[in-house]
């Protein structure tokens, strides 16, 4: 890590020297490089990518590891909500920030959406997944795919194992080394090994990693990578008998497995990050007793969980909305994020603040315009499946 910082600083010293030497002596440098970088760090990512086409100097500046790391670090403190839906062979992608509101009143406002569309690889399968430090994983049959929404690029990776007919894919990120790793397992059978690939490595080869337990991931639930650890639900093979669901953890840096017992008598509809920790959410929709049970992992080694109960927040806001919205996650500020499962023209997001017991409604105008819909062949077609990622950040 220290070596990387030294190399980055050396690159900047050389660039300053090269830049100053190219300027005539009679010319005064009005804008120092440090100030330029600070300005660039505050710009939207779309503007930064455009500047790469201005000149070689701008390209060099905006692709320098110091700048990209700084930009990504700043973005990670302000995650966005990313959504997309499929139409024929294209993905229609929308991103917008989570705005914290201080008002105690239930209110709504509109916001324009940053959107684009992109053609995706043929036969691509879109399972439930998450955005991990700016990257999202999919698959084509038994070939994993990595998608970078910021750069609008897809990377198709080789098969991790030729004999596997089914594949479970988990994407992780090591914040210490700044590396993404892909961990894949046989989807159909219990196994005590997996395949791991480090993205961006020189040879990008799959490595065989042993687990301490034979297990199989539960397909209907996706994993979460939190602070360099991948968590996912699984069944453990105990001498030929399949156990009740448990949580497996995979530390991205050390590539070690461990198990975490679920809270007694509970199950998890979904795993989410909550205040920097793993949380299990049980979301029931019963009119009388419905609500959200949130179990937060306090100590992974001792399997200690804390519990909070939130009574049917959607029912208190509007009972008619319960079947239209789904819980997608929790913001850094502790607000529950509810998104529409389907929509026709415009769509909106509900944020519930349990501390203030208040809702705010954010309506987005990006798909409401008839010109937008007609120009992209959407017409009056209803979107029946909206994919959402509540903690998306920029990744170059």
Curated annotation (Swiss-Prot):
Amino acid composition bias (Basic and acidic residues), ranges on this chain: 1-12
SMART domains recorded: FBOX
InterPro entries given in the database record: F-box-assoc_dom_typ3, F-box-assoc_interact_dom, F-box-like_dom_sf, F-box_dom
Domain F-box: 26-73
Location of the region described as Disordered in the Swiss-Prot/TrEMBL record: 1-20
Name of the molecule in the record: Putative F-box protein At1g50870
Organism for this UniProt entry: Arabidopsis thaliana (Mouse-ear cress)
